[in-house]
Amino acid sequence: MSTQEQVIRLMPDLFTPFTLKSVSVRNRIAMSPMTMYRSIDGKMSDFHLMLMGSRAAGGIGLVFPEQIAILPDGRTSTRCAGLWDDAQIESMSRVVQLIKDMGAVPAIQLGHTGRRGSEKKPWHGKTQLPPDDPDGWQVRGPSPFPHGRRYTLPVQQLSIPEIKEIHRAYASAARRAFQCG
C-alpha cells in the first residue's frame, strides 16, 4: 500500500470521536499549548478568549491554551499565563467555559521553566533578562549550570526544600485548574 493510500485509509479516524475514561473528544485534533506572551500578572486576556474560542469553534476537539506557570519564577516571561494565585482563576475560567461552549474539551499543561525563564519576548530577542531588570528574576534549576548557549544567566541551584515548594506549587495549580472547569 502506498503512503498516499495509507493516509487516505487513516484520515477518517482523525475526525472520529475519542473517549478516554469519562472524557469524550469530538475528534482527534488537538491544539498544542503555545506561549502567546499576552497575559498580565499571569491572567489570561481577551486575546486568549478570542484565540482559544475561535479554535474550539473551528472544530478542534482538544484545546490546550499555553503552558500555565505554577509560580511567578516558573514563567518564560512576565507576559506568560499562570495559576499560582487564586486571582488568576476567573480569567482562565472564562477561556475554559468558552472552549466548552464551542464543543471542545479544554486541557492544561502546567509547567515551570526553571533555568530557561526570565526571557524577553521573542520579537525582542528572546534573550534572558537579569534579575535587576524590571521584567527579570533569578532563575532556578536542578544544577547551577545554564541551559545551553542562549541561556547565560547564573542559575541558583534548587535546594531540597525549594524542590518540595515547586512540588506543592504543582498541586496547588492543579487544584486551581480544576476550579476553572
Segments (PLM) and residue ranges:
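N-terminal capping/small domains of soluble enzymes
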Residues: 2-113, 120-122, 166
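Non-globular sequence segments
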Residues: 97, 105, 111-178
